[in-house]
Curated annotation (Swiss-Prot):
It is an enzyme of class 1 (oxidoreductase). The lineage of its organism: Eukaryota, Fungi, Dikarya, Ascomycota, Pezizomycotina. This is AA9 family lytic polysaccharide monooxygenase E. Coiled coil: none annotated. Glycans are attached at residue 159. GO terms for cellular component: extracellular region. It is found in: Secreted.
């Protein structure tokens, strides 16, 4: 085989590896019960996919939404996101373990979690009507040596999973949990940040009285936000400003 063909094949294989390595949330565990998510690399090609708690998406390349899509509906629950038909039941104050298929070590960045009340059955909600409040965010953990140790590194070390606690004070009801990784490996340049939003439907039981104010998905970020336009390969001693609204505090 000619050298040019070998190099071309190597490049294609490397590209395929990068795409396959992004991953997605394949399911969650609540109180020991497993709920399957939307398996985009399988169900998107099926005429009759099973009903799940996970939102469907057309992101079959396991790709991302960048700054050019921050004011489009794709940033809400990924590309062409549509509500799942089912919901996972979780007690207020309970934990949800979100299981990723995989995540590439090089894609350092924060992990963020939001809730938005559906005002009814989440399976029929208009995603553009959802208003999200942030319940958790973790970013740079150790910046002593660039590119630093990030929340994504903890996710990887925890068998590609992330556990989030549902605030005990929120009202019971139906919510969309928006779980997101922002890859910052190319974020030193405009529109280089890579957002990977993943949405699931949950039903919170036994909650309190809190009804936090929310933000529309298309207003969560700007492509010039300090935590979006950020060079992880420079001096990190100043820390990292996590983008989006402040974390809700009861």
């Amino acid at each position: 085989m000619a050298m040019s063909k070998i190099m071309s094949l190597t490049g294609l294989l490397a590209s395929a590896s990068l795409v396959a390595g992004h991953g997605y949330v394949s399911g969650v565990v609540v109180d020991g019960q497993y709920y399957g998510g939307y398996l985009v690399d399988k169900y998107a090609y099926s005429d009759n996919p099973p009903e799940t708690i996970g939102w469907s998406t057309t992101a079959t390349d396991l790709g991302f939404v960048d700054g050019t899509g921050y004011q489009s509906p794709d940033i809400i629950c990924h590309k062409d996101g549509k509500p799942g038909a089912l919901s996972a039941e979780v007690a207020a104050g309970g934990e949800i373990e979100l299981q990723w298929t995989e995540w590439p070590e090089s894609h350092h960045g924060p992990v963020l979690n939001y809730l938005a009340p559906c005002g009814g059955d989440c399976s029929a909600v208009d995603k553009t009507s959802l208003e999200f409040f942030k319940i958790e965010a973790k970013g740079l953990i150790d910046g002593s040596s660039p590119p630093g140790h990030w929340a994504t590194d903890d996710l990887i070390s925890n068998n590609n999973s992330w556990t989030v606690t549902i605030p005990a004070s929120v009202q019971e009801g139906n919510y969309v949990l928006r779980h997101e990784i922002i890859g910052l490996h190319s974020a030193g340049q405009k529109d280089g940040a890579q957002n990977y939003p993943q949405c699931i439907n949950i039903k919170v039981t036994g909650g309190g009285a809190a009804t936090p104010a929310g933000t529309a998905g298309e207003a969560l970020y700007k492509d010039t936000d300090p935590g979006i336009l950020f060079d992880i390969y420079s001096d990190l001693s100043g820390g990292y400003p996590i983008p989006g609204p402040e974390v809700f505090s009861a």
